[in-house]
Design a protein with these regions (language model features):
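Catalytic core of pol beta-like nucleotidyltransferases
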Residues: 1-34, 43-50, 59-106
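Amphipathic, hydrophobic secondary-structure cores in small proteins
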Residues: 53-55
Length: 106
């Protein structure tokens, strides 16, 4: 049973672009102007069954942050972690820690 579960998790990681597209569809229902990037171990190809799919969400409207989180976590089966921020906060904070070549825009 554990092996099947582990394989399912690894398949989600391999399909991170498809998972990202699913997340983006949900996010766009809430904020049509949102930008989304996948980063982290799945982009580097160094993931395990314990990994998640890190998704950077850039929006001008942080008032919708919790609605976005609730909808994505409720509707997406894959293990994702949302990092929701503004363009300004991305430039001042996230860009210091996430190399540009490890950002995959969805």
């Amino acid at each position: 049973l554990w092996r099947r579960y582990e394989e399912k998790l690894l398949e989600h990681m391999r399909r991170f672009r498809e998972v990202g597209a699913e997340v983006k569809h949900i996010l766009r229902e809430i904020d049509p102007d949102v930008r989304e990037f996948v980063f982290g171990s799945v982009v580097r190809g160094r993931f395990t069954a314990a990994s998640d799919i890190d998704i950077l969400v850039v929006t001008d409207d942080l008032s919708k942050k919790y609605e976005m989180m609730v909808e994505v976590y409720r509707r997406v089966e894959a293990p994702v972690e949302l990092h929701i921020t503004t363009p300004e906060k991305y430039r001042s904070w996230y860009s210091r820690f996430i190399p540009v070549d490890e950002l995959v825009e969805i």
